[in-house]
């Protein structure tokens, strides 16, 4: 999973290994069940070891919303969706956004980034070097976080 990337856009990526570790910790807190956790191959990996943003939302976030957190109230401890009222809001522009929210493949990019940003130890990375991935240790991302390139 260390060499699998969730493609946010052409320049930004999340590391799949970081993402599932953080999500699985939240699932464990919510359910106390290892059976509900997601594995490395929960989502089919595409070209260049990437998972599209659309697949992440339609498969992973939908699973969390529909199967893990369906009985949670948004005020419950451990609820990970914050102020998100309904799952469809991942596909809609912000109601209060006069400038127009960026939709990528029909996905509200800001809402997804805000959701993932609230998870522990998940970083946004700049474009990876796919040619070098075979030489990396299993637990190390192959490029720097976007915030470290300032």
Task: Mark where each language-model region is.
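C-terminal regulatory/interaction module of P-loop NTP-utilizing enzymes
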Residues: 1-150
